[in-house]
A protein has these predicted regions:
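A short, well-structured beta->alpha microelement
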Residues: 2-8
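Glycine-rich phosphate/diphosphate-binding loops that line cofactor/substrate pockets in enzymes
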Residues: 12-13
Length: 697
C-alpha cells in the first residue's frame, strides 16, 4: 500500500512542458466512440509528468482513498490546464483533452502537443501508433500493461482479467506504476521527437537561384498542431439532426422495402431474403433465369468410410471439387437485368441498407439532438489515412449517401444551427488543379532556355490559358486537346491520378487492348504533361524513397519489392511479389546471392541491391502527392477559418459544411478556402446553401 499524493506536491514553477495521461472508465468507447461529450463515463485518475516529477492523482477509484474530484479539477484547471505558458503533451490527445474539457467545462490553453500525431508525420507508414508500440520502437521501453495484468489477476483472485476496462475497480496502489509509466513514456517520446526527428533534414532542395531549402517534418506537424483545437471544438459542437424526420424516413424505407417484396411474392409466390443468394436462387428458378454465373466450386477433403481423411502420395489430404450451385449475383447483374423482379431486389436492398446502416446508425449516435462523430485527424490506431486526409467514425459521416432520392432524403436529416442556413463549400476540381500546379511548377514552359518537347510546351500553355476562365473544366480541356470525349478524358485522367495501369484503364473504358493503345497514344501525344509528371514523380520516389506535398507532408516509400518479376499470361499481369522492409529485402537479396556464390564472394555483390530491388508502390506517387496536398490545403483552410472564429462542422472529401449566419460569413469562408494555399492556377470554391444538407443549391 502507498499514500496518495497531494496536489500541493506538484511543482510547476519554471516548468514549460508537462505530459498528461488519464485513466478513465469509458464503457461505450468501442460501440459509440469517445464518451466525453455524452458523459457516460468518468476519469478515474490523472497522471502528470514534468522533467523533475511524476504523479498519479486518483479521483474515482473504488476501494481506495481518492482526492476530492471537484477540488482536483479546479486546482489543475487553474494551475495547469489554463496556463498558456505551459505546453501540454499527450499521446492520443483527442481522447484526454476531450475528457478534461468535459470535466472542467473549459478548453485547455497553451500549446497542445500529441506524440501520436508527431509519430504519424515522422512515419505515416507504420502499422501501429499505440503508446506501447511507439515507445518500444523509439525508446526500447514498453508500458507496464502485462505487469499490471498479473498484479490484478492475483489481487482479484482471477475475477478481473482485463484491467484496461476496470481501472475504476482497482485500488490506487495497483494502478500507480502503470499510469506513471504511461505519462513518463509520453514525455520521453516528445523530448526525443522534438530533439531528433521533427527537425531532421530529410531532403535538401536546390532552388533555381542556387539557394538551399531544407525539408523537415516540423512544418506539417505545426499545421496539424494548430488544427487540433479546431477539431476538439468540432467534436463538442457536433451537428444537428432532425430526429423525428429520421424516424419517419426509417419507417418509409422499411415500408418501401416490404412493398417491393410483397410485389415479388404476389407474382412469383417466392419469399425472398434480399441479401441471401441461396434465397434469390428460388426466384431465379421460378423465373427460369439461367444466365448467371456461379460462385467458385467448393474444395472438399475426401474421407474413408470411417471418416478418416484420405492422403495422396505426398501425404497431403485428397481434395475433390464440389460444383457450386449458388448463384453469383453482383449488383450490376441484378440492376441491369431485363427481369423486373431482380431490379426490385436492388431497390429493396437500397432501402434496407439506408434504413439499417444509415438512418438507424445515425439515431444510435444522437445525443441531445446532435451527432458528435469521432474525427480521425491523421494516421493512427483509431483511423485516419496515410495521405493526411481525415476519416470519421462513430458514425462515419463521410459515408452518408449523396446520390439519388435516398441520398437526398438522408442528407435532409442534417440541419443547421438555429437562425442559420446549411452551407456547403466545395473545392472545384481540387485534384486536377493541384496536378496543373505541379506541372507548371516543374516544367516552366515560358523559359526558352529550358529544353522540352514542343507538344509538352504547347499543352502546358493551353492548360494554363484555360484556367483564366472561371468555370474551367479540366477534363473537358484535356478532351478538347486530345480530340476525345470528356468521359474518356476523365477516365484516363483519374486513372493516371490514381496510378491505374493500362489494362485496368482499358477495362474501365470497355476497350480492347489494341483500341486502348491507340487512345492512350493520342492522349499522351496531345496532353503529355500528366504522364510526364507521373513518370517523373515515380522516378523521384524511387531515387529518394519519399515525396513532399504542398505543405511539406512527407509521403514515404520505405517498403521494397524485387524488380525480377515474371509475367503470368493466365491472370494477364505480373506475378505478385512480397512487399518487404528494407532490412528484409536486403536479407532476401543476400540469400539469393548465397545460393549463387560462395559466402565470402556474396558480400561483394551487395552493392547491386538496387539493381534487383526497388521501393514498392511508387506507381502511386502522383496520387500520394495529390491526396496529401489536398489534405494540406483543406486543413490549412480549416485553421485559417478557426482563427477567424468560424467553426466547420463536417469535412468530407473536398467539402466543408457548416452553419452560416450571414452572407458576410459565407463570403469569408469562400475566400479563406480559396486562399489557404495558393497555386499556379486559381482555386475555386463553390458555395451552396439551404435549410438542410439535402436541399442545398
Amino acid at each position: 500500500m502507498c499514500d496518495i499524493p497531494q496536489l500541493s506536491e506538484l511543482n510547476l514553477e519554471g516548468i514549460d512542458t508537462v505530459a498528461i495521461d488519464l485513466e478513465t472508465y469509458d464503457p461505450n468507447l468501442k460501440t459509440k466512440g469517445l464518451g466525453a461529450v455524452r458523459k457516460d463515463g468518468f476519469v478515474t485518475g490523472i497522471a502528470i509528468a514534468t522533467k523533475n516529477q511524476t504523479f498519479y492523482f486518483p479521483i474515482a477509484h473504488h476501494m481506495t482513498d481518492n482526492l476530492n474530484t471537484k477540488d482536483t479539477w479546479a486546482y489543475l484547471n487553474e494551475k495547469l490546464f489554463q496556463n498558456k505558458n505551459i505546453r501540454k503533451v499527450f499521446h492520443n490527445a483527442m481522447y484526454d483533452v476531450c475528457w478534461i474539457r468535459s470535466a472542467t467545462g473549459d478548453m485547455l490553453q497553451g500549446q497542445l502537443l500529441d506524440t501520436m500525431i508527431a509519430a504519424s508525420v515522422i512515419d505515416e507508414t507504420r502499422m501501429r501508433y499505440s503508446l506501447d508500440s511507439i515507445s518500444k520502437d523509439y525508446l526500447n521501453e514498453t508500458k507496464y500493461k502485462y505487469d499490471l495484468t498479473e498484479k490484478v489477476l492475483e489481487w482479484s483472485n482471477g475475477m478481473i482479467k482485463d484491467p484496461m476496462t476496470s481501472m475504476h475497480k482497482l485500488p490506487y496502489h495497483l494502478v500507480k506504476d502503470y499510469a506513471e509509466q504511461d505519462v513518463n513514456l509520453t514525455l520521453k517520446l516528445w523530448e526525443l521527437f522534438e530533439e531528433k526527428y521533427l527537425d531532421q533534414i530529410l531532403y535538401t532542395k536546390t532552388n533555381p537561384n542556387g539557394s538551399k531549402e531544407y525539408k523537415t517534418c516540423r512544418k506539417i506537424f505545426e499545421l496539424e498542431t494548430k488544427l487540433f483545437p479546431c477539431l476538439v471544438d468540432m467534436k463538442f459542437k457536433g451537428v444537428r439532426i432532425d430526429v423525428e424526420k429520421a424516424k419517419t424516413l426509417g419507417k418509409l424505407l422499411e415500408k418501401r422495402r416490404d412493398n417491393l417484396l410483397k410485389i415479388i411474392k404476389k407474382h412469383t409466390n417466392v419469399d425472398v431474403e434480399i441479401w441471401a443468394a441461396s434465397s434469390i436462387k428460388a426466384l431465379l428458378e421460378h423465373e427460369k433465369i439461367t444466365d448467371y454465373e456461379k460462385t467458385k466450386d467448393r474444395k472438399k477433403k475426401l474421407k474413408d468410410k470411417d471418416g478418416k481423411i484420405l492422403l495422396d502420395e505426398k501425404g497431403e489430404a485428397k481434395i475433390e471439387l464440389v460444383p457450386s450451385t449458388t448463384p453469383k449475383l453482383p449488383k450490376d447483374y441484378l440492376k441491369t437485368h431485363e427481369n423486373r423482379f431482380l431490379r426490385m431486389i436492388v431497390k429493396a436492398r437500397e432501402c434496407d441498407k439506408a434504413k439499417n446502416t444509415f438512418v438507424e446508425g445515425l439515431l444510435d449516435f444522437v445525443h441531445e439532438g446532435r451527432i458528435h462523430a469521432d474525427i480521425n485527424q491523421i494516421r493512427s490506431d483509431q483511423g485516419g489515412t496515410v495521405t493526411g486526409r481525415f476519416s470519421m467514425s462513430n458514425p462515419n459521416l463521410q459515408q452518408i449517401p449523396s446520390k439519388g432520392i435516398i441520398g437526398k432524403k438522408m442528407r435532409e436529416l442534417f440541419i443547421p444551427d438555429e437562425g442559420c442556413v446549411w452551407g456547403s463549400f466545395d473545392y472545384s476540381q481540387q485534384e486536377p488543379r493541384i496536378v496543373v500546379h505541379y506541372a507548371l511548377t516543374l516544367y516552366p514552359y515560358k523559359n526558352p532556355d529550358i529544353e522540352m518537347p514542343n507538344n509538352l510546351r504547347e499543352s502546358l500553355e493551353q492548360i494554363e490559358e484555360s484556367y483564366k476562365i472561371s468555370d474551367v473544366d479540366f477534363h473537358q480541356v484535356v478532351a478538347d486537346m486530345a480530340h476525345i470525349s470528356r468521359t474518356m478524358a476523365k477516365t484516363i485522367n483519374l486513372g493516371l491520378f490514381y496510378g491505374m495501369g493500362k489494362i485496368k484503364l482499358a477495362s474501365e473504358l470497355n476497350l480492347t487492348k489494341a483500341q486502348a493503345s491507340v487512345l492512350f497514344n493520342t492522349y499522351h501525344e496531345k496532353a503529355p504533361f500528366v504522364k510526364k509528371l507521373s513518370q517523373d514523380l515515380i522516378e523521384f520516389a524511387e531515387d529518394n524513397k519519399l515525396l513532399f506535398t504542398l505543405g511539406d507532408r512527407f509521403c514515404r516509400f520505405n517498403k521494397w519489392e524485387t524488380k525480377d518479376r515474371s509475367w503470368n499470361n493466365t491472370i494477364n499481369r505480373y506475378e505478385p511479389v512480397p512487399i518487404l522492409s528494407e532490412d528484409d529485402a536486403k536479407r532476401a537479396f543476400k540469400a539469393e546471392l548465397l545460393d549463387k556464390y560462395k559466402d565470402h564472394i556474396a558480400d561483394n555483390y551487395m552493392g547491386d541491391f538496387t539493381k534487383h530491388y526497388k521501393p514498392a508502390f511508387t506507381y502511386k506517387a502522383l496520387n500520394r502527392l495529390i491526396q496529401g496536398s489536398a489534405a494540406d490545403m483543406t486543413k490549412k483552410a480549416m485553421v485559417d477559418l478557426y482563427e477567424q472564429g468560424i467553426l466547420p462542422q463536417i469535412q468530407i472529401h473536398d467539402e466543408l459544411c457548416l452553419s452560416i449566419d450571414s452572407e458576410e460569413t459565407a463570403k469569408i469562408v469562400k475566400e479563406t478556402m480559396e486562399n489557404a494555399i495558393l497555386l499556379k492556377v486559381p482555386n475555386k470554391v463553390n458555395y451552396k446553401y439551404g435549410k438542410n444538407w439535402g436541399s442545398i443549391k
